[in-house]
Amino acid sequence: MVLPSMNKSVEAISNNHLQQPNKFPLINGLADVRDYYVANCLLFKLNKGSLRIENEFGEFIERSAPCLFLLEKDQTITLSMSEIEGHIDFSSLEVSYDLMQKFYKVFYSTRNYNDRELSLKTKPKYFFHADLLPGMSDTFDSILHGVACPRVCSNVSIDDHDYSYFSLMYLISAFVRKPGGFDFLERAIKITTKEKVYNIIISDLTRKWSQAEVAGKLFMSVSSLKRKLAAEEVSFSKIYLDARMNQAIKLLRMGAGNISQVATMCGYDTPSYFIAIFKRHFKITPLSFMRTMNH
């Protein structure tokens, strides 16, 4: 059987960059990550502690472990993580747009009229949660360990692991038939100009991207690019900043280097400037973030 390609489609991130069981205390029992841009649909498994997620639309959810979250792409969120009995433990899988398209085709073919009607009558939801049923935690971990690349924050092919495609589909199926689930999937397969620009920039953050270069990649003029981004109420500089800050968060969480090295990998010439921008963006210094995530 030929499976849909999952090459560079799933990225694994854990609070423990060595991908071993980990429990760590937080500073003052609470860690906040503010203004984090969710670039791809995100599966988030909370093993220990509690988590509150809030987005720019005022939607929020708060749950204690163990549970699984599914977050929609193209939203900005604040994550508030609290320890329970001195610990918090989590892992995440970032699922690409291409892979969500393939899952959508499968789920769409199995839905019925009532599912569609329920979705239309439901207020849009940008994240869901599900209890961890028997086997779900092990399934998540098998995917996580199958694609994880210790200390290197990059997408990894899992084409050779046939079970991973169906395992991931199984986990996402836990959310599909929830109210608003199909509506969520339909939004997940649409891609904005903002997302296209983001994907180009983050593909090589060591490069100094100009609007003209990105416009050329998208086969449009600079004026057309500016017009499309203005219609989406976002600027080129904001997308550039989100890409750099997201990569910084991932690299720091994965332990991919010290602060100076991370600054360079994110396209910054000086560590001091990177630290200032990171603190202004996330309301926490890179060093405090590293201590929190990798203690």
UniProtKB/Swiss-Prot annotation:
InterPro entries linked to this entry: Homeodomain-like_sf (IPR009057), HTH_AraC (IPR018060), HTH_AraC-typ_CS (IPR018062), Tscrpt_reg_AraC-type_HTH (IPR020449)
Pfam families (UniProt xref): HTH_18
HTH araC/xylS-type domain span: 195-292
Alphabetized UniProt keyword annotations: Activator, DNA-binding, Transcription, Transcription regulation
Result for mutant: residue 271 to L: In strain: ATCC 14028 / SGSG 2980 / CDC 6516-60 / NCTC 12023
DNA-binding region listed in the record: 212-233, 259-282
PROSITE patterns given in the database record: HTH_ARAC_FAMILY_1 (PS00041), HTH_ARAC_FAMILY_2 (PS01124)
One term of GO molecular function: DNA-binding transcription factor activity
Keyword Cell membrane belongs to the record: no
SUPFAM superfamilies, per the entry: Homeodomain-like (SSF46689)
Superkingdom of source: Bacteria
Cited function: Positive regulator of the expression of the invasion-associated type III secretion system encoded within SPI-1 (pathogenicity island 1).
Protein name, per record: Transcriptional regulator sirC
Designated gene of the protein: sirC
